[in-house]
């Protein structure tokens, strides 16, 4: 079962949290759900260069709170916070309510190469540049290992290297216990558009096990190049506060 079901959905409430946190009536639920989908599509389409790995949405009364986890917070924030205001206006336009209070928090991803979505995005970019898929996978594995992950699995499917018959190729390094519910598995998918068609990319990253109320921390390992062990940046939007 662990190989069939979505790793995040299987672990909701155990090691994973919901990407949207709000309550609604049966009448409003589909409306708000579609709003969340439009917001996420808008953010990933317009700010794809910012390396956004996750978008968390929370609703409190008439306030909409959006938390963005990104590898390049400077691209989102802009000069003197001008990017935040532009993003807020774009979200209000997307949901069709310019009077809605939108609060935006930008959090920097501490380990870029240990994030499944960002690693899948890197693989997609390399494949779209016509880099051989085996070389791309090998480079992605090396980057993740330098970031200190406990294990990872990468699968690429489609017309690999322009072959006539589509197939799947995968590799695994370390442990990826998909059947263990307490295992913290970071899972992401991405599509690469090539001249031969689309390639599907799946990435599983094992970050440790949650034992009771305490999580087994990821080994420190080697730090990413040129980034050091500096503290991750966090930009909290306080413009709506009195």
Swiss-Prot record:
Compositionally biased spans, kind Basic and acidic residues: 233-242
SMART domains referenced in this protein's UniProt entry, alphabetically: KH
Residue ranges, annotated region (Disordered): 216-242
Positions of transmembrane segments: none
Signal peptide: none
One record GO biological process: translation
SUPFAM superfamilies: Prokaryotic type KH domain (KH-domain type II) (SSF54814), Ribosomal protein S3 C-terminal domain (SSF54821)
GO molecular function: mRNA binding; rRNA binding; structural constituent of ribosome
Domain KH type-2, chain residue ranges per copy: 39-110
InterPro entries, per the entry: KH_dom, KH_dom-like_a/b, KH_dom_type_2, KH_sf_prok-type, Ribosomal_S3_C_sf, Ribosomal_uS3_bac-typ, Ribosomal_uS3_C, Ribosomal_uS3_CS
Pfam families reported in the protein's UniProt record: KH_2, Ribosomal_S3_C
Subunit organization: Part of the 30S ribosomal subunit. Forms a tight complex with proteins S10 and S14.
Listed NCBIfam families: rpsC_bact
HAMAP family: Ribosomal_uS3_B (MF_01309_B)
Cited function: Binds the lower part of the 30S subunit head. Binds mRNA in the 70S ribosome, positioning it for translation.
Family, as annotated: Belongs to the universal ribosomal protein uS3 family.
Protein name: Small ribosomal subunit protein uS3
Annotated organism of origin: Prochlorococcus marinus (strain MIT 9303)
Name of the gene encoding the protein in the UniProt record: rpsC
